A protein has these predicted regions:
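Periplasmic-binding protein-like
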Residues: 80-85, 145-152, 158-160, 191-224, ...
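N-terminal segment of the mature folded domain
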Residues: 3-118
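Short helix-loop capping/hinge motifs at secondary-structure junctions, enriched
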Residues: 93-99, 118, 131-139, 217-225
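Short beta-strand->loop
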Residues: 3-4, 90-92, 109-137, 152-155, ...
Length: 312
């Protein structure tokens, strides 16, 4: 969850826990790129619970021996209490007339998106763009890769996480379009309604953040009960509405329908299973030497102004 939503949930859950047990709860939060956060936890930065951008990042902590097998079935909806999707945030009036993914590869369009090597949200961005190109070119991977390469040639800043990318676009005034989590885009418009607007592409992806108890840590600290209760609380009607109020899509379909005036519920969404699941996606696209590395290296070669690109 973004920090604003997380703080609200933690406060409500702490009140709920104290009412049930009489115990107070102190919550220490860490926010950043999902892949980077997962690596830090796997390398010993203790966390009782994780809420990460994608299943694969939780599996990285599992592979380090800190989360037990079967975590994805511990909570409802494959341990995904809320979802999101990928949209475009553009400047007010949409001066570059950006309407779909195809507009992001046009000359003169500056794109902001995070680095999929470090950001879970950026992987969703990449896959949503791939889904568009896959449909456009009827699965011809040579043409799909050429499309993705052109898109990354237009990327001005490759931040390590989604929040950093938003900062580059909003605060640093870089780029014409931010490929963004839907919730981040809505928050930017809410905070600056006269400066930005949202464009929903013709096709996107169902982004499913994952939550898990870090078993090794909670067993050592004796915090399993409160950690499990916190993640269970995310599925309560109250927490689902907090998620919706912060522009995440509640996993409870009845509560999601309460936000029909906020979200485009008819958007064409592919899922990670359309790509064969995260293991296959990671190996093909994001592992060292994968498709993204090849495309990004080629896109760097074709940049005429080296100072345009600022990988972070």
């Amino acid at each position: 969850l973004a920090s604003s939503a997380a703080s609200d949930v933690y406060k409500r859950q702490a009140e709920h826990w104290k009412g049930q047990t009489g115990q107070g709860v102190e919550v220490i939060q860490s926010h950043g790129g999902s892949g980077k956060q997962a690596l830090e936890v796997a390398n010993g930065n203790e966390a009782d619970v994780v809420t990460l951008a994608l299943e694969y990042d939780v599996k990285a902590i599992q592979d380090a021996g800190l989360i037990e097998d079967g975590w994805i079935n511990e909570f409802d909806k494959d341990s995904s209490p809320y979802t999101s999707t990928i949209v475009f945030l553009v400047r007010k009036g949409n001066p570059k007339n950006i309407k779909d993914w195809g507009d992001l590869v046009k000359d003169g369009v500056g794109v902001i998106t995070p680095n999929p090597k470090t950001s879970g949200g950026a992987r969703w961005n990449y896959l949503a763009a791939w889904a568009y190109a896959d449909k456009l070119y009827n699965g011809d991977e040579t043409q799909i890769e050429a499309f993705i390469k052109k898109l990354y040639e237009n990327v001005l800043v490759l931040d390590s996480g989604a929040r950093g990318a938003t900062t580059s676009f909003v605060e640093n005034n870089q780029g014409d379009v931010l490929i963004a989590w839907e919730n981040e885009a809505f928050l930017s418009v809410q905070e600056n309604p006269d400066e930005y607007e949202i464009v929903t592409p013709s096709i996107s992806i169902l982004a499913q953040p994952s939550v898990a108890v870090v078993d090794d840590v909670v067993d050592q600290r004796g915090t399993r009960d409160v950690a499990t209760e916190y993640l269970s609380y995310l599925y309560s009607d109250e927490a689902q509405r907090i998620a919706g109020d912060n522009f995440y899509r509640p996993s409870n379909p009845d509560i999601l329908n309460e936000y029909a005036d906020t979200f485009d519920l008819n958007i064409n969404l592919v899922t990670i299973q359309d790509f064969g699941g995260w293991d296959e996606v990671q190996k093909k696209h994001f592992d060292d030497g994968g498709v993204f590395d090849r495309i990004y290296e080629l896109s760097l070669i074709h940049i005429s102004e080296p100072t345009r690109r600022t990988p972070i």
